[in-house]
Design a protein with these regions (language model features):
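N-terminal small-domain helix-loop-helix segment of the aminotransferase-like
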Residues: 14-104
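PLP-dependent aminotransferase-like
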Residues: 117-160
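Amphipathic coiled-coil/heptad-repeat helices and related helical stalk/stem segments
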Residues: 17-21, 105, 109, 130, ...
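Alpha-helical elements of the RecA-like P-loop NTPase motor core of helicases
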Residues: 80, 110, 131-135
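Conserved beta-loop-alpha segment that forms the PLP phosphate-binding cup at the N-terminus of a helix
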Residues: 76, 96-123
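Generic N-terminal amphipathic, Lys/Arg-enriched alpha-helix
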Residues: 2-12
Length: 160
């Protein structure tokens, strides 16, 4: 028996389309392909030895908890250190509850869209724009208004 699970999807999920970024990244897997796209650092630049040392140290000191799930907002110790750094180096009054650790910019953009965008809201973006942000905002049914750029950045005259 074949079950059509897509009929159970939410309206929002049915509006989603395949990620253009994901499709482009598939091309980077082709043999001999040299990608000049952003977001794919040169693997030779990775500090592999330092990462190995950090992993070894972590397992020596915290072997029972190193692979456990953490809190949704991120490890409290890391958030405390970052809050203190914000206070000391940037004079920003920052507390533990003011910070959330994400796995990257895309997760942060998706969370921001979830919190701030209602269906039908309009957001402004430069042209060109980060495709991942446009897709995250589109998923929450926002309307995009593009603003042209000139040699100094966003063309503010076009906002009038």
């Amino acid at each position: 028996m074949v079950v059509n699970i897509e009929r159970l999807f939410s309206k929002r999920a049915n509006r989603l389309r395949s990620s253009e970024i994901r499709e482009l990244l598939k091309l980077t897997q082709m043999p001999g392909m040299i990608s000049f796209a952003g977001g794919l650092p040169n693997p030779k630049a990775f500090p592999v030895e330092i990462i190995h040392k950090c992993i070894d140290d972590t397992f020596k000191k915290n072997s029972e908890t190193a692979l456990q799930y953490g809190t949704t907002e991120g490890v409290a110790k890391l958030r405390r250190v970052l809050a203190e750094r914000m206070r000391k180096t940037r004079d920003i009054d920052c507390e533990l509850h003011d910070l959330i650790i994400t796995s990257g910019a895309q997760q942060a953009l998706s969370l921001a869209a979830l919190i701030f965008i209602d269906p039908g809201d309009t957001y402004l973006t430069s042209v060109p724009a980060y495709l991942g942000a446009v897709q995250a905002f589109h998923a929450y049914e926002a309307n995009c208004e593009s603003i042209p750029m000139d040699e100094e950045g966003i063309d503010t005259d076009s906002l009038r």
